[in-house]
């Protein structure tokens, strides 16, 4: 086999793999009249013009570690009964909360959505393994730097102040209207995490936009957030 033949065969195999990956997203079930984020924007999307001047796309390796650590540290705090904030008192300890691990596919889908700089949830983001939940946060500053990623996650944690501990065993619709980011963070069955981010300058502000995707998805009405 010549070198050219070998390269051609490698190219064909790579193309087949790429097409298979794209087709997988097309096969996933989405809500009526919606399309999967990866089908709309492709697997190699770039930041939208809507972002303004982009200063950074995607969390750095250090930020990935910080994101994962913050989620797990806070999960430990809640699971051990040390979270004292909340309606009707602090949050009860958890029996079944797992540590989260980083998931590259979730991060890829999250980054594709973050690249759009739209502070709304995308309509379809599931992967073949499970349905996917999502948290969004954006914070701005007029300084030269961008808000640290941990500060964005803490916005979700702070929602616990509005969460009634009596809703842990069966989540009502009212339980996610103000506190859905918090409940997704501590949802016991969500043990995979992947996030995307954009640091951009727009309208005179330095903005840090964070999208975190969680699998399996949490925030199912009528189900327990975690076991007490």
Curated annotation (Swiss-Prot):
Domain SCP, chain residue ranges per copy: 69-214
Top-rank lineage group of the source organism: Eukaryota
Summary of the tissues where the protein is detected: Expressed by the venom gland.
SS bond list: 30-124, 51-117, 195-212
The entry's keywords: Allergen, Disulfide bond, Secreted, Signal
Keyword Signal in annotation: yes
Similarity comment text for this entry: Belongs to the CRISP family. Venom allergen 5-like subfamily.
Protein name: Venom allergen 5
Organism encoding this protein: Rhynchium brunneum
